């Protein structure tokens, strides 16, 4: 094929740019399309099909949704722990990883060990994007990210008047600009 005929074929949209496809010698051989040949071929493949655990025909339910581990459709589970030593804290982290809410009652621990335990579990809670809340004296609530924690007692204690007063004080302080530290006392008058 010459260059001009190839260009014409491209412009015309001819799918076969080369006429060489017809020149290839393929030995087509004989194909046996009889039902007996098809049955023997399928019986030869039958042991392979039975051994295939990923066969789509076996137990296909029509859904390809896979549940996340630790999430159940039942009610949320809360784990109450009253540890006596810091060695019990990995159980609290494991419960959080299983998406369980953990309430730690640290009244049985020494104050320095209790502080260490709270820091440890708070770090684990932060790592899984969870929430923490102090419930009472030495009692803490740690929740995974799938649980929403609201504190209604804290919301009732704050009043809008206090918030408004804080906003007014902040805006009054912001209107007075402090003098820069590099400016000399006499230079401000110039």
Swiss-Prot record:
Any GO BP annotation: division septum assembly
A Pfam family matched in the record:
SepF
Top-level taxon of the source organism: Bacteria
Record keywords: Cell cycle, Cell division, Cytoplasm, Septation
Q: Which InterPro entries match?
A: Cell_div_SepF, Cell_div_SepF/SepF-rel, SepF-like_sf
Keyword flag Ribonucleoprotein: no
Q: Is Phosphoprotein one of the keywords? A: no
Which compartment or compartments is the protein found in? Cytoplasm
Q: Pull one GO CC term from this UniProt entry.
A: cytoplasm
Q: Which family does it belong to?
A: Belongs to the SepF family.
Its quaternary organisation is: Homodimer. Interacts with FtsZ.
The record's section on HAMAP family has:
SepF (MF_01197)
Q: What does this protein do?
A: Cell division protein that is part of the divisome complex and is recruited early to the Z-ring. Probably stimulates Z-ring formation, perhaps through the cross-linking of FtsZ protofilaments. Its function overlaps with FtsA.
Listed name of the protein? Cell division protein SepF
Q: Which organism is it from?
A: Synechococcus sp. (strain WH7803)
Gene that produces this protein: sepF
